[in-house]
A protein has these predicted regions:
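Short, glycine/serine-rich, charged loops/turns that create anion-binding
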Residues: 1-2, 31, 101
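A general structural signal for well-ordered alpha-helical segments in protein cores
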Residues: 7-11, 48, 76, 106-107, ...
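A generic structural motif
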Residues: 18-25, 120
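N-terminal beta-loop-helix "entrance" segment that forms/cooperates
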Residues: 26-46, 135-139
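Helix-loop-strand module that forms the ligand-binding subsite of alpha/beta enzymes
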Residues: 43-118
Length: 180
């Protein structure tokens, strides 16, 4: 995961543009997760426990992930594998902020994985934000772009509306974001 990637810029902009009242936390320990192995699930490694705890504490999850060779990164897949069958992830509201307008292979693959995991994909909050190829190199560049900022603000509104709807129904603040 590159700290200066365009996905990191989008993640930083998402944090900067998060609505008031949104408690926004980034899970940045992907590199510490061992390769998923169901044989070691009984003695859960600490980074995997931290991931699961973060997901359990979240009302919604926002994923920012690049496309690699027409797919999601191995790191993202490994992170998701640690959540397969984890009850707090099931029906968890999830938004996907895709940093490339034309990265449809990874975008669709990620969404299919999330649907298989029984995530509650928030359609209006799953957006492609064309950071790649737009001369964007930082979160400030995204925030300064009226078009890109508007897409993010709209996606955030969809996240908040969805979470508020869940709360109004008496079911389960937006807390966890992962991958760069």
């Amino acid at each position: 995961m590159r700290s200066q990637s365009r996905s990191a810029a989008l993640l930083g902009a998402a944090k900067a543009l998060a609505p008031a009242g949104v408690d926004f936390h980034v899970f940045d320990r992907h590199g510490e997760l061992p390769l998923f192995n169901p044989d070691i699930e009984a003695a859960l490694p600490e980074p995997a426990m931290a991931l699961r705890d973060a997901v359990a504490a979240a009302d919604a999850i926002v994923i920012v992930s690049p496309e690699y060779a027409h797919g999601i990164s191995g790191n993202m897949k490994n992170t998701l594998d640690w959540l397969v069958g984890h009850p707090p992830f099931v029906f968890k509201p999830v938004a996907v902020f895709n940093p490339a307008a034309d990265a449809h292979h990874a975008d669709e693959s990620l969404k299919e994985i999330l649907r298989t995991m029984s995530a509650d994909l928030m359609g209006d909050a799953c957006v492609r934000i064309p950071v790649i190829g737009a001369g964007i190199t930082s979160a400030a560049d995204v925030v300064a772009s009226p078009m890109l900022a508007a897409v993010l603000v709209s996606a955030w509104q969809a996240v908040v509306c969805h979470v508020e709807g869940i709360r109004a129904r008496g079911e389960a603040a937006v807390r966890v974001v992962f991958d760069r």
